[in-house]
């Protein structure tokens, strides 16, 4: 145990003690939070906005030519007219607008829409019609599919999406489609059929995320990737698309964890550290797809937990702040269950976020260090429970 702890310290990996302190201590954060290392919104958005300046009121002079005098008349020439025109831009147009429910350090560039988008995403993620069944493997599938088989499908879907370099967010949405489909449709254990379901879910998700997907891949290529070689293989993909769409009731727009990661980091800049944080958060959310049970958490909870661990991984300190709590709607203590479950799936937190899902997790290959991490996180209350199926 001590040797493992020493190795953890030498590698710079945050131990469970740091995780406990981060989760339990940040709820009492005072006004003396260090600004150094905080990744929040820029203090000013001046460099990101066009510099319009304050334009003075415009004055347009309309000059009318002198009209010839009519015969027998003596009319005066019409005088010059000055028309006052309102400024093209309001004063201080280069200043961002901040609404009442926003942190003062977080400017909103689209104030009339930002709050509406937030409310819409929150409503959609809690809509039962747009959520997978909590225990679809035990109920709908009736034991015909195990958590390991589902993980194998996710791994195949990940490899499929990376092979064709499909749009970001495709894997998250494809897994969302898959879980909703399996929640209402009993599936066989035929390998080719399962591959067809997974690949078609990726195909649908890719077309949803990127309108130019068909320039990269078509139905015949999807079927061939699954192992089908007949001349009419594209029809199998089309039929499966129709079946999945019907199972989803043609509702494809539910937010995923990836959606909320993008939403919560929308004020990040283009700095190296901020890009690293976003990449790590996306890798954490993608890694959670392999474990059956994370779908029971709301996507916003999974996204916020991934950002928490990404900040702990990249910054090494201050994984949460008042601005993040206000932005996400979650205090650090609210994320305890999901953070600990996500943390327990990572054998080496320092490097795991940058390893793509290339294998199916097998409990027989869990390292001794990983077991020690799991045992050290037993402070989690029973109500949070490990979602792993």
Swiss-Prot record:
State the SUPFAM superfamilies in the record: Cyclin-like
User: Is the keyword Magnesium in the record?
Assistant: no
Q: Name one GO molecular function term.
A: cyclin-dependent protein serine/threonine kinase regulator activity
Q: Gene3D superfamilies, per this entry?
A: Cyclin-like (1.10.472.10)
Please provide, in alphabetical order, the Gene Ontology terms of the cellular component aspect for this entry.
Answer: cyclin-dependent protein kinase holoenzyme complex; cytoplasm; nucleus
Recite the UniProt keywords alphabetically: Cell cycle, Cell division, Cyclin
Q: Name one GO biological process term.
A: G1/S transition of mitotic cell cycle
Pfam families found in the cross-reference section: Cyclin_C (PF02984), Cyclin_N (PF00134)
Recorded coiled-coil stretches: none
Q: Which family does it belong to?
A: Belongs to the cyclin family. Cyclin F subfamily.
Q: What is this protein called?
A: Putative cyclin-F1-3
């Amino acid at each position: 145990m001590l040797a493992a702890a020493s190795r953890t310290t030498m590698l710079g990996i945050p131990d469970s003690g740091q995780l406990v302190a981060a989760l339990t201590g940040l709820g009492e954060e005072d006004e003396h939070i260090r600004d150094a290392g905080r990744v929040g919104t820029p203090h000013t958005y001046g460099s990101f906005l066009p510099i319009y300046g304050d334009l003075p009121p415009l004055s347009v002079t309309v000059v009318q030519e002198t009209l010839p005098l009519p015969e027998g008349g003596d009319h005066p020439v019409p005088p010059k007219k000055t028309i006052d025109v309102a400024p093209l831009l309001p004063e201080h147009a280069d200043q961002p607008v901040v609404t009442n429910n926003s942190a003062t350090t977080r400017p909103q560039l689209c104030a009339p829409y930002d709050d509406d988008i937030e409310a819409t995403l929150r409503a959609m993620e809690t809509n039962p019609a747009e959520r997978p069944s909590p225990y679809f493997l035990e109920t709908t599938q009736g034991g015909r599919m195990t958590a390991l088989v589902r993980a194998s499908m996710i791994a195949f879907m990940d490899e499929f999406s990376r092979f064709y370099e499909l749009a970001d967010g495709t894997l998250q949405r494809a897994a969302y489609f898959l879980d909703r489909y399996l929640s209402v449709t009993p599936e066989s254990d035929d390998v080719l059929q399962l591959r067809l379901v997974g690949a078609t879910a990726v195909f649908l998700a890719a077309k949803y995320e990127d309108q130019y997907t068909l320039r990269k891949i078509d139905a015949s290529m999807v079927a061939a990737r699954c192992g089908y070689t007949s001349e009419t293989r594209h029809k199998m993909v089309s039929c499966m698309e129709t079946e999945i769409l019907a199972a989803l009731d043609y509702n494809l727009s539910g937010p995923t964890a990836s959606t909320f990661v993008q939403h919560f980091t929308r004020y990040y800049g283009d700095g190296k550290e901020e890009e690293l944080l976003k990449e790590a958060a996306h890798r954490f959310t993608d890694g959670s797809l392999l474990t059956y049970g994370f779908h029971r958490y709301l996507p916003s909870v999974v996204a916020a937990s991934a950002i928490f661990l990404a900040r702990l991984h990249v910054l090494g300190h201050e994984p949460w702040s008042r601005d993040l709590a206000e932005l996400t709607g979650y205090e650090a203590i609210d994320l305890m269950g999901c953070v600990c479950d996500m943390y327990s799936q990572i054998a080496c937190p320092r490097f795991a976020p940058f390893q793509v899902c290339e294998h199916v997790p097998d409990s027989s290959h869990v390292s001794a260090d990983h077991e020690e991490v799991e045992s050290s996180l037993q402070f989690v209350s029973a109500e949070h429970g490990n979602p792993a199926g």
